[in-house]
């Protein structure tokens, strides 16, 4: 029985993998079976085709079972609702009222009622009929088709209300709420209808429905619907930040903004920092945004007031503390390096036992290591090093459990690789200390590795500077992206050609060609050849095997000409991609660093930013005042442009009238008319003059920019928001 267990587990794993791979095929088969069952059943087919005559006959047929279901566990009422057959649905409800509350029984549509289908199809009349006959407005569909998954093209939640809100039917939303639909209902992920609206691609309808649903959120509950979190602890506002939904974020910020005053082009506004400010919050909005897997989330950092809040925190507290921390770390590494350079060594007592043995000094024992005055000074540095390593671990380990190992080490913006490096460094320092205390030889191994890792961690502090911050991200992406892929290819090539070289020289005298005398040496020599560190290690004073020339020529072409240049091209492409996002990435680094410092620093060294509303009668909330400089209204500029155009027409007409024949003027004078020359409103300069030509270019450029920038729906302000 025990021998069969591994095979059973393997079979389950294979079945799960095959089922996951063939999900689409499985769904296709279900739908084909559904159509087949509908065609074979007279009741289901009549419901599909809206055949009232057949339905009336079946209604009076004693053998007809209105509870019969199709391949997916759907009833005839489900079929009628699916094909928008109102008459058939009403007849079925009259013949079998219990069908109104029946739900689908089979995956992937478990729990789906006819009301769900009618709402999705926006059949208002059918929705009214179902609600009038007792359909539950809070019915829940729990099948896999209603989950947020890569297999599903849409995610509308599990309740009819969320369906109606996502399809944008305001009338159905009002109907459902009037018939008792719970606007606070949550699906299996804990998402309310507001969460689900944030996830919709049609952001205009989502914002409109968001406002409509909030208007029904009464004061019966202590917590607003907007503050209800899902299973991940995300409110709709935080979810908008994680998803990078800038439209919804701006919409919600407009609801929180309070305009203080306007003075010409200047406007002063107060922004509510609830859920935005990371001060004192366990699940920080800023940290969620920078750690999001979606690139669109970084655009949230450009929005007001997030941009201003981060800039305030970074310039006032973050940058000075970060620079101070970097200086302390460099001093710490200098101390550690000095202790390693002057580590306790003594001359070796034993004689050499092998001709290749080149060791002349060895490590002192613990009793001999701390005797002289210089040893005691070194001991102080070693204590500083060990205490620093312990502090590093105490600061890093709690964050691993708080954030999660995969996210903490995997997010580049959060400094993931540097966390691995610094934790490994601290562990190696403690290992070196343990080896020193126990008189175990070989401390040079962890000590040398710790030196390399410790100094590499200095690059982490480059993120405090705009010029160097993206540079570190570029190095990380090249190492963990391009270099890892290249190393796999390089390993395969080296393994193959090293084996070939070893076989070719297996019958030759190793004294004349020792680079391939044994297999490990052949592997290392091939690695050096691959990186062009050495030339072809051949002794041309003796006859070489013919296959060596062929193999070496092939290796040189593949390794040097092809693969190394391919690697350079890959790194160039990575450099170009990172360069396109350098400012965005650096800003995300600054936000992540600011949040990290704010969480670590004592409260008396990092006070809360913003304005407390309690002091000004604004409640127990914090605000940030932002002044906006409004751009000139393009419509006002357009008036001046039109004035320029009209003045030009007057000039042209005037010059044309001056060029008319003199007979016209004499005829006019003969009639006794007196023509008075009035000065034009604009400057009367020649069209061919340089000044007028420059004025013309300036005016046309202004017109061109206005034509590109004008929009009939735009207003005067800097921040324009409309639906």
Swiss-Prot record:
Extracellular side: 342-378, 402-412, 463-485
Places the protein is found: Apical cell membrane
Entry keyword Calcium: yes
ANK repeats: 38-68, 72-101, 110-139, 156-185, 189-222, 232-261
Reported modifications of this chain: Glycosylated.
Cytoplasmic topological intervals: 1-320, 436-441, 571-723
Regulation: Activated by WNK3.
GO CC terms, sorted: apical plasma membrane; calcium channel complex; plasma membrane
Quaternary structure note: Homotetramer and probably heterotetramer with TRPV6. Interacts with TRPV6. Interacts with S100A10 and probably with the ANAX2-S100A10 heterotetramer. The interaction with S100A10 is required for the trafficking to the plasma membrane. Interacts with calmodulin. Interacts with BSPRY, which results in its inactivation.
Descriptive protein name: Transient receptor potential cation channel subfamily V member 5
Gene source species: Mus musculus (Mouse)
């Amino acid at each position: 029985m025990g021998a069969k267990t591994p095979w059973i587990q393997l079979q389950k794993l294979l079945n799960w993998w095959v089922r996951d791979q063939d999900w689409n095929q499985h769904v296709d088969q279900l739908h084909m079976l559904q159509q087949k069952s509908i065609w074979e059943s007279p009741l289901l087919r009549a419901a599909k085709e809206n055949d009232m005559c057949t339905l009336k006959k079946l209604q009076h047929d004693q053998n007809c079972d209105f509870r019969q279901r199709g391949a997916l566990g759907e009833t005839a009422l489900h079929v009628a609702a699916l094909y928008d057959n109102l008459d058939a649905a009403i007849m079925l409800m009259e013949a079998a009222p219990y069908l109104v509350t029946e739900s689908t029984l089979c995956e992937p549509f478990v729990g789906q009622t006819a009301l769900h289908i009618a709402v999705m199809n926006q059949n208002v009349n059918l929705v009214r009929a179902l609600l009038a006959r007792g359909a539950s407005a809070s019915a829940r569909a729990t099948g896999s088709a209603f989950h947020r998954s890569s297999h599903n093209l849409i995610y509308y939640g599990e309740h009819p209300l969320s369906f109606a809100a996502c399809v944008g039917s305001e009338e159905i939303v009002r109907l459902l709420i009037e018939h008792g639909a719970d606007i606070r209902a949550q699906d299996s992920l804990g998402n309310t209808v507001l969460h689900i609206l944030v996830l919709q691609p049609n952001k205009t309808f989502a914002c409109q429905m968001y406002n409509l649903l909030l208007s029904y959120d009464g004061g019966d509950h202590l917590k607003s619907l907007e503050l209800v979190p899902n299973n991940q602890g995300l409110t709709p506002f935080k979810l908008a930040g994680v998803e990078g939904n800038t439209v919804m974020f701006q919409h919600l910020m407009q609801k929180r903004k309070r305009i203080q005053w306007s003075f010409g082009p200047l406007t002063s506004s107060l922004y509510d920092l609830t859920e935005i400010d990371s001060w004192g919050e366990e699940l920080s909005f800023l940290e969620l945004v920078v750690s999001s897997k979606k690139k669109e989330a970084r655009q949230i950092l450009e929005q007001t007031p997030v941009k201003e809040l981060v800039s305030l925190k970074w310039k006032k507290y973050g940058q000075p503390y970060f620079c101070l921390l970097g200086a302390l770390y460099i001093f710490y590494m200098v101390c550690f390096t000095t202790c390693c350079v002057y580590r306790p060594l003594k001359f070796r007592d034993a004689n050499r036992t092998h001709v290749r043995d080149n060791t002349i000094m060895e490590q002192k024992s613990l009793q001999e290591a701390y005797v002289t005055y210089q040893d005691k000074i070194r001991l102080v540095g070693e204590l500083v090093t060990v205490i620093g390593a312990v502090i590093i671990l105490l600061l890093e380990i709690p964050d691993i459990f708080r954030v999660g190992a995969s996210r903490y080490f995997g997010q580049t913006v959060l400094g993931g690789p540097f966390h691995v490096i610094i934790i490994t460094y601290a562990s190696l320092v403690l290992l070196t200390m343990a080896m020193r205390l126990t008189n175990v030889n070989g401390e040079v191994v962890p000590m040398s590795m710790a030196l390399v890792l410790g100094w590499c961690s200095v690059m982490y502090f480059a993120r405090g500077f705009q010029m160097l911050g993206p540079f570190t991200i570029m190095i990380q992406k090249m190492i963990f992206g391009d270099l890892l892929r290249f190393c796999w290819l390089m390993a395969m090539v080296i393994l193959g050609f090293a084996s070939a070289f070893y076989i070719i020289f297996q019958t030759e005298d190793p004294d004349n060609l020792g680079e391939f005398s044994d297999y490990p040496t052949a592997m290392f020599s091939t690695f050096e050849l691959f990186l062009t560190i050495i030339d072809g290690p051949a002794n041309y004073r003796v006859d070489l095997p013919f296959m060596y020339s062929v193999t070496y020529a092939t290796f040189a072409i593949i390794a040097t000409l092809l693969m190394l240049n391919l690697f350079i091209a890959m790194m160039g492409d990575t450099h170009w991609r990172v360069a396109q996002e350098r400012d965005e990435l650096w800003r995300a680094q600054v936000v992540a660093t600011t949040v990290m410092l704010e969480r670590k620093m004592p409260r008396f060294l990092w006070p809360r930013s913003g304005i407390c509303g309690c002091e000004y009668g604004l409640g127990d909330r914090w605000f940030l005042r932002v002044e906006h400089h409004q751009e000139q209204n393009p419509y006002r500029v357009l008036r001046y442009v039109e004035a320029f155009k009209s003045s030009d027409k007057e000039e042209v007409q005037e010059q044309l009238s001056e060029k008319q024949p003199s007979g016209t003027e004499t005829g006019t004078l003969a009639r006794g008319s007196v023509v008075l020359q009035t000065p034009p409103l604009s400057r009367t300069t020649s069209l061919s003059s340089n000044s007028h030509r420059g004025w013309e270019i300036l005016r046309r450029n202004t017109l061109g920019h206005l034509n590109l920038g004008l929009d009939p729906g735009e207003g005067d302000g800097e921040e324009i928001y409309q639906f």
